[in-house]
From Swiss-Prot:
Belongs to the LipB family. Catalyzes the transfer of endogenously produced octanoic acid from octanoyl-acyl-carrier-protein onto the lipoyl domains of lipoate-dependent enzymes. Lipoyl-ACP can also act as a substrate although octanoyl-ACP is likely to be the physiological substrate. Pathway: Protein modification; protein lipoylation via endogenous pathway; protein N(6)-(lipoyl)lysine from octanoyl-[acyl-carrier-protein]: step 1/2. Keywords: Acyltransferase, Cytoplasm, Transferase. Its EC number is 2.3.1.181. The keyword Transferase applies. This is Octanoyltransferase.
Length: 245
């Protein structure tokens, strides 16, 4: 039975996402070179199928993509304002977003049957993972019930202004999660202007990054914070083997 919580995400018990004691550690992989989107999706789909079949352990895969746009299951063609980069349709939830160098994408392949088969609790846990990661850099990230993702307040821009610093888009297949999160570390923010990001056209809601907020961070700093925060929420990790996914 599919379990979908109806409570506000901020009240959900995301701590229940840890697996039972004695479960294998989650593999933690980092790709140093940009990964083409079709290649990433094919690899992710294959790994998720292997996890569902009991033939592979869970995996978190950190990477960057070359510049591109993706349209989720709620995407609208009208939200693509300029055809700057390739556009890929994808099975994740959500609308249009940008991926490119300087953005840390984390594809998360977890078996929620072994954890907690609850879509909203899982999304809340992903949000908490991002919030805890940002906290390591003294950035206060916040969730919004009407806007999935993580936001930072921008009083310097005006009353009620907020910028999105991280996006979330997920898909579940046989209760194994696919896709995941994207945190803006130092991407070219002008590339977001070619789309209506996540369908949000309100001028009070923009896009930002850690570097845009004045943080002198590099991707390695973010990766360290991501792993520590992940383990607090989802459990133990281990470095993936050098070859293969």
């Amino acid at each position: 039975m599919i379990n979908i919580s109806t409570s506000p995400r901020q009240t959900l018990d995301w701590t229940a996402l840890k697996p039972a004691d004695g479960s294998p550690a989650v593999e933690w992989r980092i790709s140093d070179s940009p990964v083409p989107y079709p290649e990433a999706v094919a690899t992710m789909e294959a790994r998720a199928a292997a996890i569902a079949a009991g033939e592979a352990t869970e995996l978190v895969w950190l990477l960057e993509h070359p510049p591109l746009y993706t349209a989720g299951t709620s995407g609208h063609a009208s939200d693509l304002l300029e055809e700057r980069f390739p556009l890929f349709t994808t099975g994740r939830g959500g609308q249009l977003t940008y991926h490119g160098p300087g953005q840390r994408v984390a594809y998360v392949m977890l078996d929620l049957k072994r954890r907690r088969p609850d879509v909203r609790a899982y999304v809340a846990a992903l949000e908490q993972w991002i919030i805890a990661t940002l906290d390591a850099f003294n950035i206060r990230g916040e969730r919004r019930e009407d806007r999935v993702g993580v936001w930072v307040r921008r009083p310097d821009k005006g009353v009620g202004y907020e910028d999105k610093i991280a996006a979330i888009g997920v898909r579940l297949k046989r209760w194994v999660s696919l896709h995941g999160i994207a945190i803006n570390v130092e991407p070219d923010l002008s590339h977001f202007k070619a789309i209506v990001p996540c369908g949000i056209s309100d001028p009070r809601y923009g896009v930002t990054s850690l570097v845009d907020l004045g943080l002198p961070v590099v991707m390695t700093d973010v990766d360290i914070a991501l792993r520590a925060a992940f383990e607090n929420i989802f459990g133990e990790t281990r470095a993936a083997a050098p070859a293969g996914i």
